[in-house]
């Protein structure tokens, strides 16, 4: 399976805890195509680092 770099264009929600993990809702762009997703983190500190331009794999 191939992974694609995605970049956050807008943070929709602040970090919130659900199912024992921390989540952040974001809008992103990958290969020129916009999308929405929920990013999962192990700690609140990691989730708070998400800002515009944050890179993740999708």
Describe the predicted segments one by one.
Residues 15-34:
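Short aromatic-glycine-(Arg/Gly/Cys) micro-motifs in beta-strand/loop hairpins
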Residues 35-39:
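Short beta-strand segments
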Residues 1-2:
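Short aromatic-glycine motifs in intrinsically disordered, low-complexity regions
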Residues 40-58:
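A short, charged, amphipathic alpha-helix used as a generic interaction element across diverse proteins
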Residues 6-17:
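Short amphipathic beta-strand and strand-loop transition segments with alternating hydrophobic
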